[in-house]
Amino acid sequence: MDDQPVVAAVDGSPDGLRALEWALDAARRYGATLRVLHVRPEPPRTRQEPQGAGPPGADEDPVLAQARARVDELGGIPSVEYVVTEGVPGALLPETGTAARLLVLGSRGRGGFASLLLGSNSLAAARDAACPVVVVPRPDRGGGEEEPVHRDGPVAVGTSAESPDTATLEFAFTEASLRRAGLRVVTAYPWPLQTMLLPGEVAPAQVDQEAMEHETRALAEGLLAPWRERHPQVPVEVVVLPGDAAGHLVGESRDASLVVVGRHRRRLFAPARMMGSVTQAVLLHAHSPVAVVPPARAEQ
């Protein structure tokens, strides 16, 4: 069995139960322990309350009791742990990533404004955790009727043809392999090209869009060669499109079982951990679960 657990963060909300179900499936795929975690917001202490008083144990926690009932109902997982702790969820949840294979959360919990598409705890975990974080959206995220969940759909991954994120690609290929699903590798190129000219400069020759697409595809096919060699059983389709990468990935999410995106590498004078605009947009608007993968240590 895998030494690193798949962690499901629950809080008693329907979003948390959806995350629990997704995490249970993931634990089965990886042959890993499922750790069900409830981070209780720390209540204010009263004068009469003993200083050493802590949260109820896992056996007494009502949120974990609800989760345990759901796990027992679904079954099929050999090893499950239930953990309760107290503190600030937005700070404690990312810390669990140091010893986890995967951290899974719902897009919204019980706190905050119901109209928000992504909760602050989910955003903090996706931005700061050391392991991949999967955010499971609400089925009615589109604002209308509940959308079907494509559990058997392909895995979609966004990557740059010029500077690929190795950790993101490895995660996507592994997920596709374990699911026995196809992998759609989405890469976008800038179009139309924006050219800024200073006074006296001559405009460059017109760039042909077909040539730009051909060059981008050739780069993408080249960078994927090592992963195709390691995962020959995964059918791969390279999707090269102009313009908005986030919009294309959100479009892919309608039929995908999972969309995989990378978190930004560390940059000079920037926060140690950050997310780019594409990753944030996909988290906010995707119809399928989204995996946010931190960069490999060598790339940070």
Q: Where are the regions that the model predicts?
A:
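Structural beta-alpha unit
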Residues: M1-D2, D15, D72-L103, R110, ...
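Actinobacteria-biased recognition of intrinsically disordered, low-complexity terminal regions
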Residues: M1-P5, Q51, G142-R151, L198-A203, ...
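Small/aliphatic-rich secondary-structure junction motif
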Residues: M1-P50, R151-Q206, R228, V236, ...
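General small-molecule cofactor/ligand-binding pocket signal
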Residues: R35-L37, E81-T85, V134, R184-V186, ...
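A short acidic, glycine-rich active-site loop
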Residues: A53-P62, A205-T216
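Glycine-rich, Arg-bearing micro-motifs that act as flexible, cationic patches
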Residues: L105-A124, D128, D152, L258-L284
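Short beta-strand elements of ligand-binding domains
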Residues: G106-S107, V133-P139, V290-P294
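Protein-protein interaction modules outside structured cores
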Residues: H214, E237-G251, D255-Q300
